[in-house]
A protein has these predicted regions:
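Non-heme Fe(II) oxygenase catalytic core, chiefly the N-lobe of the double-stranded beta-helix
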Residues: 2-244, 249-283
């Protein structure tokens, strides 16, 4: 098996060819893929056309699978595999209401957020429905030294849904909400494999900054978010059926797009990889 890595943007993202994810990989390939994900943060495996069992095995290359939170969107025979389907999305003014239509990192209100998330494209509309990624490592690197010193020791409370969330969340019962954690996370984290610093942002879940009043805290969050989502930090993935894409939630944020014909069918499988508690870069 001859693995080939093709960078897709100046700072992150790589296309991986020369590997068939419908077959088990050996330890050398496994270790190389793990290292490549840590370095490039987003890996695209084209033309894989994976079945659910293949997706489970492919995810396990990178670690143990993490249960899906939205239990009504999982495969009965493969409970670790979720799905995103247009058939489950509401319409408002002729536009699909897509979950995740704002840059974020998955389940940041978990004590141990997923280290990675992956999608496998089954059915894709003719146009639109891209997934965008931004490199929050490079975004931190490009901050002024003064701002780095200011934010490097800061922390933020992450909840199910921020009081100033810009995006739609699935409505939950009071009983379900009571089961969902709230956790204080570092504003700047250290990647456990590479040691790189990265901004840790999720405007849908962050409830201000410790030690600042709410208005000041949200102003800082929004300023960092605007900086981190600038076009120079972006890779935009245009989906093709058969794509398997995995990304490192500790190095990038991502967002969905609802800019496609709601009458066209879009269906992707989804898995998450277990992570550890986040490490503050200041530690």
């Amino acid at each position: 098996m001859s693995l080939h890595i093709s960078p897709m943007s100046p700072s992150f993202g790589a296309k991986i060819t020369g590997v068939d994810l419908k077959k088990a990989v050996d330890d050398d390939v496994r270790h190389q893929l793990q290292k490549t994900l840590s370095e490039y943060a987003v890996l695209v495996f084209p033309k894989q056309f994976l079945e659910p069992a293949d997706i489970v095995r492919s995810g396990e290359i990178f670690g143990n699978l993490m249960p899906q939170q939205l239990k009504k969107y999982i495969l009965p025979d493969f409970p670790m595999v979720g799905y995103n389907s247009t058939k489950d999305l509401p319409l408002k003014d002729g536009k699909l209401q897509v979950r995740g239509e704002n840059y974020h990192t998955d389940h940041s209100n978990s004590v141990c957020p997923p280290r990675a998330t992956a999608l496998s494209a089954v059915k894709i509309p003719a146009t639109g429905g891209d997934t965008q990624f931004v490199d929050v490592r490079q975004a931190f690197d490009d901050l002024s030294n003064e701002l780095k010193e200011k934010v490097i020791k800061m922390r933020s409370l992450h909840v199910h849904e921020s009081s100033r969330s810009p995006r739609m969340f699935t409505k939950l019962s009071e009983e379900d909400l009571a089961q969902i954690p709230e956790v204080i996370q570092p504003l700047v984290i250290r990647h456990p494999m590479t040691g790189r610093a990265a901004l840790y942002l999720n405007t849908g879940r962050m409830e201000g900054i410790e030690g600042m009043n709410l208005d000041e805290g949200f102003a800082l969050i929004n300023s960092l978010y605007e900086h981190a989502t600038s076009p120079q930090y972006e890779y935009r993935h245009q989906w093709t059926e058969g794509d398997f894409v995995i990304w490192d939630n500790r190095s990038v944020m991502h967002q969905a797009n609802a800019d496609y014909n709601p009458e066209e069918f879009r269906y992707l499988y989804r898995i998450m990889i277990e992570g550890d508690a986040l490490q503050a870069f200041s530690q």
